[in-house]
Amino acid sequence: MSLWIFLRHGESEANRSRVFSGHQDVALTALGEEQARAAGQQIADMPPLQHVLSSDLQRARCTAELALQASGCTLRIQTTSALRERNLGEWQGQSIDRLKAEGARAVLHSWSGHAPGGESLAMLADRAVAYLAAQPDHGTTLLAGHGGLIRVLLGLIDGTPWDEIGRVNIPNAIPMTRTVGPETWTDILRSLHPQSAN
């Protein structure tokens, strides 16, 4: 069993402006950079990292870089598009408050619902878990990512009913830990597609 530390990026320009970013590559704010460094100080008090994974989007990657610097860790960051935020299609760059007032909340919370041209939580889960299941067990791992991504991964680890996962709040730049076994991601991937596992 290995300790995994899940870290949502610090405040981004899109967070501050209250717009959906999804796959858009937006930067951290000055506050977001401070949050990332503070997270690194917390991570310094945890077991030493042996592996670091990150979304390739700059808000997650920069959060990982700043957190590692603050923690004194010099590991290389393995970045991948497989750990990106949920693609929100036509909603990317649009006002969160306006879209939620127009009924987007139910779609966002649904396991299978998606924005026009975007991904559902189920599609995000398929993409991310397939990638993680293909990785060797490196021991204590930091995963720097996004609210939607981490919401899905923690929900699946914890056994949260799929249609409740979308309601889980993931704060910016607060390290969240779970114990992950060598078969955890493979078992979760099978659970997402029980018919193909037979």
Question: How would you describe each model-predicted region?
Answer:
Residues 7-71, 102, 119:
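Active-site-proximal alpha-helix that buttresses catalytic centers in soluble enzyme cores
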Residues 69-127, 167, 188:
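Phosphate-handling substructures
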Residues 56, 111, 147:
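Short secondary-structure boundary segments
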Residues 49-56, 78, 140-144:
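Short glycine-rich phosphate-binding loop at a beta-alpha junction
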